[in-house]
Amino acid sequence: MTQPLLEIKNATKIYGGGFLSGQPTTVALQDFNLTIGDRPASITTIAGESGSGKTTLANLVLGFVKITSGQILFKGNDVALMDKAQQMEYRREVQAIFQDPYAVYNPFYRVKHIFDLVVNNFKLANNKS
């Protein structure tokens, strides 16, 4: 079995709180697990209701915020332990595309239209399928 491209193990992110802050804590993500294989040119979509942790997950995967507990591994390397040079290389390979709610939920667009835009713009396919 090959090593996964991205592996998220028991990821938890808690905002707020702190020893002396007196602020309440907010659990934005709790014990989240995801494995993305090493297939070339694949697109993975995370969808969910508002406030379900999608943006927090993206920020954790991209290394923009620190994980409270758990691990995020890219090609077997812990994202939290990467130095600046490794982070720059990592961010060249992993990107988040945030949704445009007006385009995604436009009743005049079919799902195929939305995916075709991504596939064509990033040249992910050689032919129409």
Question: What annotation goes with each model-predicted range?
Answer:
Residues M1-S129:
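ABC transporter nucleotide-binding domains
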